[in-house]
From Swiss-Prot:
This is Gene product 16.5. It comes from the Viruses. Keywords: Early protein. The lineage of its organism: Viruses, Duplodnaviria, Heunggongvirae, Uroviricota, Caudoviricetes. Belongs to the phi29likevirus gp16.5 family. It comes from Bacillus phage PZA (Bacteriophage PZA).
Length: 37
């Protein structure tokens, strides 16, 4: 695996974790009012 491929994989992983993080945040904010009761 050369530097370019490694960078591409890194970018892909980063973008996917960020997307998952945002989805998780969104779900958390939606469920917080129910949890607070």
């Amino acid at each position: 695996m050369n530097q370019k491929e490694f960078q591409a994989v890194l970018d892909w992983m980063l973008s996917h974790t960020i997307i998952q993080f945002h989805e998780y945040n969104y779900m958390l904010q939606k469920s917080l009012p129910f949890l607070r009761r």
